[in-house]
Amino acid sequence: ELEPQGPPHLGTDLSKKQGPWAEEEAAYGWMDF
């Protein structure tokens, strides 16, 4: 389920980023990617 930003899925993109990036985001805080 790791697609190179193929289909324009904003909702899914956010969910995906909140998964693997959740740890980094929590560590940095300012990183809102």
Swiss-Prot record:
GO cellular component: extracellular space
The keyword Secreted belongs to this UniProt entry's keyword annotation: yes
Protein family according to the UniProt entry: Belongs to the gastrin/cholecystokinin family.
PROSITE patterns in the cross-refs: GASTRIN (PS00259)
Lineage per the UniProt record: Eukaryota, Metazoa, Chordata, Craniata, Vertebrata
Gene: GAST
Name of the protein in question: Gastrin
Key words, A-Z: Amidation, Cleavage on pair of basic residues, Hormone, Pyrrolidone carboxylic acid, Secreted, Sulfation
Record PTM Sulfotyrosine, positions in chain: Y28
Any one GO molecular-function label of the UniProt entry: hormone activity
Annotated source species: Chinchilla chinchilla
GO terms under biological process: G protein-coupled receptor signaling pathway; response to food
Reported function: Gastrin stimulates the stomach mucosa to produce and secrete hydrochloric acid and the pancreas to secrete its digestive enzymes. It also stimulates smooth muscle contraction and increases blood circulation and water secretion in the stomach and intestine.
Pyrrolidone carboxylic acid PTM positions: Q18
UniProt-annotated stretches for the region Disordered: 1-21
Subcellular location(s) of the protein: Secreted
Modification sites for Phenylalanine amide: F33
